[in-house]
């Protein structure tokens, strides 16, 4: 797993990251609204198969400013260790600024007003921001989430 890039409409692909990268399992990808080649990426160091065993995604947020050739962790203000994964990111851009939001499978939402240089906690303890079985794989007591996986 990793991040890939294509310049020919998907006929061929170049690997930008690999399993040894800080984000070996990229999930949320947000392009910068005005700076070409800038992307914010949230995700986990480990893949979902490993989450099932160790209940740890070791997630963070990174940015590339050169189309994926190099990546910088932008996690000041985030917990030192994110057990859950950053599965969703959103951006609100306006003339002269932008706000980034990151949601985790731990049920936390974080906000950055300075392009990821620093983060503040918006809320913790809400329902997990997750898809499919990802939350289930990260939870040490999966029997507690059975009700969350049903539909009314």
Predicted regions: what they are:
Residues 1-152:
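Extracellular glycan-interacting surfaces
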């Amino acid at each position: 797993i990793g991040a890939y890039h294509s310049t020919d409409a998907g006929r061929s692909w170049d690997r930008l990251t690999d399993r040894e990268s800080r984000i070996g399992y990229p999930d949320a990808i947000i392009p910068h609204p005005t700076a070409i080649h800038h992307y914010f990426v949230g995700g986990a160091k480990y893949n979902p198969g490993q989450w099932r065993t160790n209940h740890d995604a070791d997630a963070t947020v990174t940015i590339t400013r050169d189309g994926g050739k190099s990546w910088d962790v932008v996690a000041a203000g985030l917990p030192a260790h994110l057990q859950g994964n950053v599965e969703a990111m959103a951006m609100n851009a306006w003339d002269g600024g932008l706000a980034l939001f990151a949601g985790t499978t731990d049920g936390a939402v974080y906000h950055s007003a300075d392009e990821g240089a620093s983060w503040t906690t918006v809320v913790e303890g809400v329902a997990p921001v997750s898809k499919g079985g990802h939350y289930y794989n990260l939870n040490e007591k999966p029997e507690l989430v059975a009700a969350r996986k049903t539909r009314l």
